[in-house]
Amino acid sequence: MDPQYARWVKAAALSATALASILLIIKIFAWWHTGSVSLLAALVDSLVDLAASLTNLFVVRYSLQPADEEHTFGHGKAESLAALAQSMFISGSALFLFLTGFRHLASPEPLQDPSIGIGVTLVALFSTLILVTFQRWVVRKTHSQAIRADMLHYQSDVLMNGAILIALALSWYGFRRADALFALGIGVYILYSALRMGYEAVQSLLDRALPDDERQQIIDIVTSWPGVIGAHDLRTRRSGQTRFIQLHLEMEDMMPLMEAHVLAEQVEHALLYRFPGADVLIHQDPCSVVPKERHAHWEL
């Protein structure tokens, strides 16, 4: 386990949980004093943020545990489960916003004190921007799916807070239905983000192959290595921070076993240099036993 990976992923999860807790308290106060349905939408979203971030925090801590006898490939899939759980939380909040928005659209109510709502929303907007910037940096360093899902969630919050500012300003100037209309628009965007997040999580749980650019890098490293005649049957997937890479190397028929072993280890080390922490499994094939149609055939 890379200690840097564990430290930054935990820091990002803790930061999100702390911010969600603070914003929830502030937004309850603001909604109570304004009656804004857009602020109610923000309040519900912060409640969902807190539940999702707490789930994320516990799951991330679990996923960082090393492999054991019962989980020989580690616990990385827990990150995908966290992302899937977040998508469910977010979908539920979007449906609630639709119901509330339609009700206030049919019967708009004047806001009591929009200035409080505007001030609170500005605080939420800038603090969430800081969190998203930190999360994006962590994702670039770790490629954590759980933190990436959380980041996408809070990115939608940034847009939502911007929309709420506009809605509150319009309501202040007499556009009474603007509040409800923006709440509905926010609900649509949140639902879209949730569905996209859920799709990515399911694809990871189904062991989707690594991205095309990473697969091409693997192919380039293997085929350019001296002594390798060819390769085939590349299999890749990702679980948490760990990439899994499996392939067959094609070698000269009469190459001594020890030489073949050393060559395979050299290729493995080259792949590990490019993809630190990867789990690489290489099978050596004499080139004469590989059918012509399988030679250099990377797909299964």
Curated annotation (Swiss-Prot):
Catalysed reaction equations from the record: Zn(2+)(in) + H(+)(out) = Zn(2+)(out) + H(+)(in); Cd(2+)(in) + H(+)(out) = Cd(2+)(out) + H(+)(in); Fe(2+)(in) + H(+)(out) = Fe(2+)(out) + H(+)(in)
Membrane topology: Multi-pass membrane protein
Chain residues that bind Zn(2+): D45, D49, H153, D157
Highest taxon of source: Bacteria
Gene3D superfamilies per the UniProt record, alphabetical: Cation efflux protein transmembrane domain, Cation efflux protein, cytoplasmic domain
Any one cellular-component term (Gene Ontology): plasma membrane
InterPro entries hit by this protein: Cation_efflux, Cation_efflux_CTD, Cation_efflux_CTD_sf, Cation_efflux_FieF, Cation_efflux_TMD_sf, CDF_Transporter
Segments crossing the lipid bilayer: 12-32, 40-60, 82-102, 114-134, 155-175, 178-198
Gene Ontology MF terms: cadmium ion transmembrane transporter activity; ferrous iron transmembrane transporter activity; metal ion binding; zinc efflux antiporter activity
Compartments it resides in: Cell inner membrane
Main subcellular location: membrane
GO biological process: intracellular zinc ion homeostasis
Keywords in alphabetical order: Cell inner membrane, Cell membrane, Ion transport, Iron, Iron transport, Membrane, Metal-binding, Transmembrane, Transmembrane helix, Transport, Zinc, Zinc transport
Subunit structure comment from the entry: Homodimer.
Annotated family: Belongs to the cation diffusion facilitator (CDF) transporter (TC 2.A.4) family. FieF subfamily.
Biological function: Divalent metal cation transporter which exports Zn(2+), Cd(2+) and possibly Fe(2+). May be involved in zinc and iron detoxification by efflux.
UniProt name for this protein: Cation-efflux pump FieF
Gene source species: Yersinia pestis
